[in-house]
Design a protein with these regions (language model features):
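Hydrophobic transmembrane alpha-helices and immediately adjacent juxtamembrane helices
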Residues: 1-255
């Protein structure tokens, strides 16, 4: 059985639809959870950290929401991808379906959830007194970069999981480290210069900071900033793609 262009496109759409529906199957609120989950977390963290970090910072709620929203998308997308290849083995070991489609569909379904949450984010931006500006269209760039970063990391993790199951426990711990290294609830100005430079080695922080610069400070990051984020995105895709390419023929033997 072979797949032409139309068949592959149809298959990918159906897989995305399956992954998107599966997440909210048999829930009362359905897709609304994409909006409710970050709101509940925002409320709790704003109450806890707003007192300590938000007193001398304007639009702290949006500052916090920017970090939470992008981190939650990153964490849910990459954690959920860990077992994607393993859990779909019963399909691609019997039907010649491109294995990478399962990771791509998972990442895209998570991206759709993120876009729903992003709509809620802009409602909060308006409520906080920040008016819409043309600069906001610049957010398309970090949004797409984060999607591709998540995709690259997801391909890497899902492939490694087949051969090294301990990654299922290690990655959530690393995500916790990444959370603290992404300046979600604290102002980076309290950090020494060397720590600020180290933060810029974290692509997630770069995306979060991009959102904050555009929305809160009404400025678009420099060309060098954009190129650095682009380089990190390409690096993540290359690592994921190369790992998958090296291991893909061995995957059916280990599932």
């Amino acid at each position: 059985m072979s797949f032409n262009g139309k068949s592959r496109s149809f298959l990918l759409r159906e897989l995305i639809r399956r992954d998107f529906i599966k997440k909210y199957k048999r829930t009362t609120f359905g897709i609304l959870w994409s909006a409710l989950s970050p709101l509940f977390l925002l409320l709790i963290m704003d109450l806890v950290f707003g007192t300590f970090f938000g007193r001398n910072m304007s639009h702290y709620t949006i500052y916090l929401f920017s970090g939470l929203l992008l981190y939650n998308y990153f964490a849910s997308s990459t954690k959920g991808a860990l077992s994607v290849l393993y859990s779909n083995a019963s399909i691609y070991t019997k039907v010649p379906v491109p294995k990478i489609y399962f990771i791509l569909s998972h990442s895209t379904a998570q991206f759709i959830n993120f876009l729903v949450s992003l709509a809620v984010y802009f409602v909060f931006v308006a409520v906080d007194g920040i008016s819409f500006k043309l600069n906001f269209f610049a957010l398309i760039y970090p949004t797409l970069c984060l999607y591709l970063i998540n995709l690259g990391i997801s391909i890497f993790l899902s492939t490694v999981y087949i051969f090294f199951r301990d990654i299922n426990y290690l990655w959530p711990l690393l995500c916790r480290v990444i959370m603290y290294a992404s300046a979600i609830f604290y102002d980076v100005s309290i950090l020494p210069n060397i720590m600020r430079r180290l933060l810029k080695c974290n692509p997630l922080y770069m995306c979060i900071d991009y959102f904050r610069q555009v929305v809160i400070h009404n400025s678009v990051p420099t060309l060098s900033y954009n190129l650095m984020l682009c380089a990190m995105t390409v690096f993540c895709l290359l690592v994921g793609g190369c790992t998958y390419r090296i291991c893909r023929d061995k995957i059916p033997l280990y599932v």
